[in-house]
């Protein structure tokens, strides 16, 4: 496990200068756990928050042994200590967040607007990687532009188990929904192509949970009607431990039955089998 030293004087001064350009105050949420690294995460954020009155650090402590995280917003978090090369994209992300803007191309923003289900993007990085800051900066902006992208930046020198889990051989590596991988210095167009061209029929059940829990049955039913497919991942929500998720999926099926009775009839055998096992 690598040990991160406190920010250098030069890094702190650079951060102070960058944070002076913030237009609106913002919060950095640091989720601390019993993990041995939690103390380092706090020591990293404290001087940054002290460097600007526009940055408020909120520390939340959990009893679990889960990894600590630095959360810039609900869909963008770091399992990393972004010093050194990674400091620039981290600070730039805070600046863009404060301005509610990005530097993404208009065509990118238009395509991101078509995302309607959550997509998990894990970015594997290391402190010595020359291309990682560029990719991290791009992915962070995509997360600022679309709440449906759930981004986690992971330093594999701190969390080697993720490198083992995904058989990472080089960085940066992007892992999309725990399956597809993109390696190297990826262009904006290529990454957006990958993110926006996925078929909902292949999505994990968790990808549909956000829609169901937000009560947007009409949206999910409309997607199924448009694709003439009752997504298997969505149907699995009928057995979710969360009662509200199960009920939400029932509402989706009711909405779907009104729009396309034939489509609902096509999954009757699955529903009967499901009820038999309950």
PLM features: what roles do these ranges have?
Residues 72-101, 170, 175-208:
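Non-catalytic, surface beta->alpha helical segment in thiol-disulfide oxidoreductase systems
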Residues 227-239, 261-275:
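Amphipathic alpha-helical scaffolding segments comprising HEAT/armadillo-like alpha-solenoid repeats
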Residues 214, 228, 241-244, 276-278:
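Alpha-helix N-cap/helix-start positions at coil->helix boundaries
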Residues 5-48, 111-147, 152, 248:
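Local sequence-structure signature of Cys/Sec-based thiol-disulfide redox active-site neighborhoods
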Residues 207-226, 247-261, 273:
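Structural detector for internal amphipathic alpha-helices that build alpha-solenoid repeat scaffolds
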Residues 33, 53-64, 146-161:
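Thiol-based oxidoreductase modules, predominantly thioredoxin-like and allied folds used
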Residues 2-25, 81-114, 200-206:
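N-terminal leader/targeting and pre-domain segments
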Residues 25, 62-77, 160-177:
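Structural micro-motif
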